[in-house]
């Protein structure tokens, strides 16, 4: 028998081998467990499926966009996206019918013959048309050529297609006979019947022209004015930019570049753009100047003197064209004066004013006061009780008669005022307990504040459109995770006709899943914040996912945007598809909540809602174990680009990767109206510092620890690229590694495929820890129009 010790000696090499093999197996197992994820071109292609140009066409009968017809019957047509194309439908509320607006097949056939092209019933070459007065024919334009077809489709004939007033940069008079436009800094009028043109003003010169809105980031030759109802007068202004500082951009090309210069006042500038209000009488013509000092180039809404059209905001004519009401806004947006002018003499009467400690707003996108000379009243919107409420003033005395709306929640838009019935129709948010406070609802209330009625009952976000008479409205309602339903309602909210219900079958078949709404607590631990979460469609709760914040900090809007249904919200779902959790959170300092909520970071723009973003993301990680909070990223554009870089500098241990595009990184280099409203007037102290120093990202760049990609268009005339270059310079001086992409001759948006791909690559490489497919190529396609657009 072999001694035990010898047996052990002989077995030792085999034991060592077994240990080595076992150890190697364990190492291999550990390496497999920690192996970086693999991201392929197929993964990118799958993610691309969830970009808007792929998802939008998959939603059929998405919503109703009514084109109302003349008359009291409330008839309207809309265009609907259907299987394999689109069709036009005509709604008759009196008959309670919904039928084809014309014979699609026959119109397609006769038009094909007349135009020498090939069309079919669901692929007609137009998206808009007008009925003839008798309703027997339709007129439309195809590639600049006018056509008229009878609704039965028996004939189609080519017609002259006059250039649209908008294309000519004109504003047509209410009676449809005249069009006003700018020529060489003066206003001219054109007779639409005779084409005869004549000047209305002659003293306009460079930097002191009429009706122009070329101030700061706004550059347009569209005249800003308001015709009187009787088409005899025009309310406008002479804009004074003499001595105002300029902004400069240089294009990129072979040979000598072109220098682009325009007036662009900045915070703290002694001389900024002002306007001198005038009324132009077409008889003569003659110009009546209002007898007041020049007004600031300001309005009661975000950062311009006009809304989404060329109409001048904060100006209203009386129905008889004898009186002109307007609001003068101080440079710091803290003081508003309601005034009424005599357009014949230029005399101005100050009726009442309002002062606030931060900034005044009368709405989002459109001013929400109403001039009611027929009843000697003014409807005024104010946040004096911490919510956007309506108030009724006496037009003769300027005294407050009564508060119209009360309680929590905001009036966001006055959509109709019925002086005869003494009723106000308005869009409100946050007024229904237990519902998302961002959901819009339509309400009706009496001038005296009594009989408040909810007209859109569904627990959803309501996108409404009233008929010209106000007797009907189209109600499109949905939620981020619930498809759209469209109905026609009477003025009292009663349903008249069911119109459409969105069909998501194609979208769902493509793998789409809705975002997940959530709530978290704000920085104060008390206030509820609302957001959306996007997960990979192949989500596995046993895995750990990095989290990415898609941010827009406001202050004029938030990260989430619409609370209605959308097949795509930027590239949030597409990015999530690569192996991330993507979130959007509306933090404190964004609108549509209380005034206190909106004022949260007034005077401290560097805040950018970041304390709320960090707090919210941490809460989500505690709630959901599949979120890896140690791998947090952030991205955004414009204000979101500003916030992204700020996040990387102010929270360097939390945010590991950021992609910042087109950021206004130092608001001293962004237009005056924006910054002076949200940060306050620039105040320089005796020691050389100012109240704007801390908001400047370059002053915090030395704190960078993570991976940061900066991008900007070199011809960005909204946020000039020097904002990003200030940060670049600071990072270089601090010896920090970073990445930079400049887009030659590009403007502000940077929504092109190359930027999307670079953003995806950056997060995949630095946050996910994988190597992205090399130079993946997107294949965008034109977005098919949605129903009614």
Kindly give the residue locations of the regions a language model identified.
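Bacterial N-terminal signal peptides that target proteins for export
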Residues: 2-15
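Beta-propeller folds
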Residues: 10, 26-484, 488-489, 499-505, ...
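Bacterial N-terminal signal peptides
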Residues: 12-24
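Serine-hydrolase catalytic core recognition
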Residues: 246, 292, 312-313, 321, ...
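Small side chains
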Residues: 23-26, 235, 264, 531, ...
């Amino acid at each position: 028998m072999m001694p035990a010790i010898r047996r052990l000696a002989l077995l030792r090499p085999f034991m060592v081998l077994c240990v080595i093999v076992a150890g190697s197996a364990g190492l291999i197992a550990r390496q497999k467990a920690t192996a970086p994820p693999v991201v392929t071109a197929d993964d990118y292609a799958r993610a691309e499926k969830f970009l808007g140009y792929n998802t939008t066409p998959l939603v059929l009968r998405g919503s109703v966009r009514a084109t109302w017809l003349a008359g009291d019957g409330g008839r309207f047509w809309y265009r609907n996206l259907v299987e394999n194309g689109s069709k036009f439908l005509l709604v008759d509320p009196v008959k309670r019918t919904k039928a084809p607006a014309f014979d699609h097949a026959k119109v397609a056939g006769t038009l094909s013959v007349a135009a020498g092209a090939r069309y079919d019933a669901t692929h007609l070459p137009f998206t808009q048309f007008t009925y003839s007065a008798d309703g027997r024919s339709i007129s439309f334009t195809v590639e600049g050529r006018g056509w008229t077809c009878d609704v039965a489709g028996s004939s189609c004939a080519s017609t002259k297609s006059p250039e649209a007033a908008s294309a000519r940069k004109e504003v047509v008079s209410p009676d449809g006979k005249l069009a006003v436009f700018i020529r060489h800094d003066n206003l001219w009028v054109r007779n639409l019947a005779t084409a005869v043109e004549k000047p209305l003003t002659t003293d306009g010169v460079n930097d002191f022209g009429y009706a122009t809105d070329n101030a700061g980031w706004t550059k347009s030759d569209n005249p800003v004015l308001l015709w009187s109802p009787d088409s005899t007068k025009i309310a406008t202004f002479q804009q004074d930019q003499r001595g105002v500082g300029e902004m400069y951009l240089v294009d990129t090309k072979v040979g000598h570049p072109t220098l682009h210069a325009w007036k662009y006042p900045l915070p703290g500038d002694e001389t900024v753009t002002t306007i001198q209000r005038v009324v132009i009488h077409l008889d003569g013509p003659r110009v009546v100047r209002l007898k007041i000092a020049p007004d600031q180039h300001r309005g009661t809404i975000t950062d311009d003197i006009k809304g989404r059209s060329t109409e001048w905001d904060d100006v209203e004519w009386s129905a008889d064209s004898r009186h002109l009401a307007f609001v003068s806004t101080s440079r710091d947006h803290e003081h508003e004066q309601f005034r009424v002018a005599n357009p014949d003499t230029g005399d101005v009467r100050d009726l009442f004013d309002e002062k606030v400690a931060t900034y005044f707003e009368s709405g989002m996108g459109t001013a929400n006061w109403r001039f009611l000379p027929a009843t000697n009243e003014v409807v005024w919107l104010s946040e004096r009780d911490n919510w956007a409420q309506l108030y009724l003033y006496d037009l003769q005395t300027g005294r407050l008669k009564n508060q119209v709306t009360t309680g929590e929640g905001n009036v966001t838009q006055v959509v109709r005022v019925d002086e005869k019935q003494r009723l106000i129709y308005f869009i409100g948010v946050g007024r229904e307990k237990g519902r998302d406070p961002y959901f819009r609802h339509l309400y009706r209330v009496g001038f005296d504040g009594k009989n408040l009625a909810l007209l859109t009952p569904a627990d959803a976000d309501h996108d409404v459109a009233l008929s010209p008479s106000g007797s009907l409205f189209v109600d499109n309602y949905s939620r981020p995770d619930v498809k759209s339903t469209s109905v026609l309602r009477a003025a009292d909210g009663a349903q008249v006709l069911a119109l459409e219900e969105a069909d998501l079958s194609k979208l769902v078949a493509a793998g789409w899943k809705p975002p997940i709404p959530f709530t978290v607590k704000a920085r104060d631990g008390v206030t509820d914040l609302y957001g959306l979460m996007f997960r990979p469609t192949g989500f596995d709760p046993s895995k750990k996912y990095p989290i990415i914040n898609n941010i827009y900090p406001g202050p004029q809007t938030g990260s989430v945007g619409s609370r209605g249904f959308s097949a795509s919200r930027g590239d949030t779902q597409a990015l999530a598809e690569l192996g991330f959790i993507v979130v959007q959170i509306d933090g404190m300092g964004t609108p549509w909540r209380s005034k206190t909520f909106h004022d949260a970071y007034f005077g401290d723009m560097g805040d950018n809602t970041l304390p709320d973003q960090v707090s919210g993301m941490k809460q989500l990680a505690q709630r959901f174990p599949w979120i890896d909070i140690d791998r947090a990223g952030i991205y955004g554009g414009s204000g979101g680009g500003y916030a992204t870089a700020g996040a990387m500098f102010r929270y360097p241990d939390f945010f590991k990767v950021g992609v910042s595009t087109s950021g206004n990184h130092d608001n001293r280099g962004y237009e005056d109206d924006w910054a002076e409203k949200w940060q306050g007037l620039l105040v320089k102290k005796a020691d050389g510092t100012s109240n704007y120093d801390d908001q400047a990202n370059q002053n915090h760049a030395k704190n960078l620890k993570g991976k940061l990609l900066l991008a900007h268009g070199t011809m960005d005339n909204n946020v000039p690229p020097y904002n990003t270059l200030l940060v670049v310079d600071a990072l270089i001086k601090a010896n920090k590694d970073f990445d930079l992409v400049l887009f030659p001759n590009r403007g502000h948006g940077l929504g092109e495929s190359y930027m999307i791909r670079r953003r995806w690559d950056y997060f995949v490489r630095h946050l996910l820890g994988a190597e992205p497919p090399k130079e993946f190529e997107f294949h965008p396609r034109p977005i098919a129009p949605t129903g009614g657009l």
